[in-house]
Amino acid sequence: MTTVSEALKAFRDSGAKYLDLRFTDVKGKWQHLTMDGTVVDEDLLNNGVFFDGSSIAGWKAINESDMVLKPDLSTTVMDPFTAQPTMMIFCDILDAVTKEPYERDPRGTAKKAEEYVKSSGMGDTVYIGPEAEFFVFDDVKFQVEMNKSSFEIDSAEGPYNSAKNYESGNLGHRPGIKGGYFPVPPVDSAQDIRTEFLEELKNLGLRMEKHHHEVAPSQHELGLLFDTLLKQGDGIQLYKYGVHMVANSFGKTATFMPKPVKGDNGSGMHVHQSIWKDGKPLFAGDGYAGLSETALHYIGGIIKHGKALNAFTNPSTNSYKRLIPGFEAPVILVYSARNRSASCRIPVSDSPKGKRVEVRFPDPTANPYLAFAAMLMAGMDGIKNKIHPGDASDQDLYELSDSEVAKLPTVCGSLREALEAVDQDRAFLTEAGVFTDDQIDGYIDLKMQEVYDLEHSPHPVEFKNYFSV
């Protein structure tokens, strides 16, 4: 554990002129407060900094707004994008009066989830491996007004630009619909920017493995190596920040929206998960696909609570434009070895250490701390109550008829449905106080505002379908 004096020395030795206090709001957006280096001392690092919590959506009311940003001294990293040398540090949120962890702090929830596994005796380490996909565009415009609503995206890779007149000429090399996985350049025009993504993410302290073009034009993925749950929550925040900043430096813009384009694949965030104890993987065994009973029960918990999990793993109205048949989205709550159409997949591994469960329905609009913690709690409920997931489904689920699909459990069809599901199925989350009822109620209220916003807004497709009726 890093001491206050060690952290202060590291800050001064780094040459940083500023300390950027980073924290995550309920929706998963990274926020920050920058301190001048001349005021950074042991007292600040030990006691934190007061701030106005009422300005953060879903947190405290203005009459009880004081909160504390408490630095986690083990999480310092230099920001490679600032003009002046700046050190970033992750912060936890404390109540200003009690100095206790604030129960709506997402990072605090992730910490409690890890502690729950340890205190249960079922394991001591939770490993997470997220695969966050994203799009990179050249230009994006959108507006939502009383009398007009529209968006327009543009990318040189877009098949809609095959006849466009460019000043330098239209060279023609671009992936078609569902054609991005994965030809070499010049069809793949993003080799250099993806390499730069990887380099800067390594500069941010992340352990990177690979990069590649994804299925849709302008869509990409960077391989982030697995780590413990809390560290991967931090890692996804660094990942998103790095992608946004590098894209900006190239004069482009990146988005983690699940479905920004019509008629092609959306962006998911498949999450690989495993539990270990005493240095041994608990998911390896001699059952189906080399799984242990513990792993099967973990899957059982994920499937049982799948609809409630959607509130955290797929927390945007846009999420459910991705979770539809026909675009490689896993909408059926079953499990399988190798079968990528299942919502829970067992990846091939030659080693027991690599035995894990891949949950495929999450997307990168998720708050990583809440999503990872919620899936862990669902899996732990499955282990605790020995919830068996039933037989595996090794057939291509995309080929099933509507009547066959109707007999199988599926993910939610809308954010409203997901919020209603977690409202009714929350006991597994509140076990040992990992999540609290107040936290879940506040989350539902906040996300329902997004539901209302969409449901109360006329859509251009409605004009196309109904204006002349």
Can you annotate each of these PLM segments?
Residues 1-469:
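Glycine-rich, acidic/polar active-site loops that bind/position phosphate-bearing ligands
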